[in-house]
């Protein structure tokens, strides 16, 4: 949007190569996206629907963290994407960090498959089937100085061990499978992750958590800083998880992304849940969700 509003001419560079320059008036959104990704994208948000589980996979009651979270309640189901919307500082990331055991909580209960759990650290969260793709992939999601091979196994190293030793054959086979299925552009599984583009780094993070065999996948700003083509590939991963019956939670500051991919949306403000909106609700639109994010009440 900023390009069309501010620029006189637009140049597209893809994979380090010059593609095309045109006057802005000669571009439209579709042609620009096609030039950026090298192929036509018929649907920017390829939403697919899974079978909603009968009971919530994750249930949170009265979650509290001093000065940050004030009685957060929500339910997340298998076979669905639960979107979290809100302004910066609304408490969305803080809620997920608390559930994941990255930050201590002062009160509240967390249930997974109907059983109350006490999660004090990320390892306990992983053992309880939670995967957390953080918004800071470089600082918290990856070891940039290490290879793709190493990063892919970090969430579940036991899966790749024979006794006390790593099974290198299994690591390579799994890594090559993820490179192919996630379309990671790399010359080798031994490429240093820090040398990859942002979109390919994000795919490595996703591959790492797919190896964790989780039931609950938390995506925090999953498409921030990646190109349009890579975004669609991330959405397709979410779709495959949903169709496999997994519980997917997506935090996003992009309203079209929230509306395009979510089955339900939790709206937060100031560490509290202001509204929960189903996809078939009359309030499932940008205006009403933003109204709730600003503290307004949704009637009916």
Specify the residue positions occupied by each region the protein language model found.
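Glycine-rich phosphate-binding loops of nucleotide-dependent enzymes
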Residues: 1-300
